[in-house]
């Protein structure tokens, strides 16, 4: 499938006991290359976890286009990640992207989008829906206000915004509907 960017996940997609090995495998794989002009974005573990510092130190070697920080609530979290990245060689041209997946983060979307080094936002619709205690709705009505708010913040700041994942990956018709909705926003 032709894509512009690939997000590699060291957070939710990796079991706790596999964090170190997943990190090592990812770094080795990315150093082999083979991605052409596709942007490589790496979602690290949250700064409040025991794995974030090791994630950052390890991925500096691959010089990713962006580091994606989960559960961003405010611009201070972006500044904290930037300060940690500045202590390592390899991040001189690396942007920071924010996972927008908490109610507090959504309310602070404009401040987050305007933070230094910000290059993009990724909607964490699953975690956001969980935090909002919403029911599943194929039209995503409970999430539309949050999606729209973040689109406005990202566009005003001139950064990229990416819609959340589609969970029913075998439902191509549903994927098309949700992708069209995301495109139209």
Task: Go through the PLM ranges and name each one.
Residues 1-185:
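Expand to "…catalyze enediolate/carbanion chemistry for C-C bond making/breaking, isomerization
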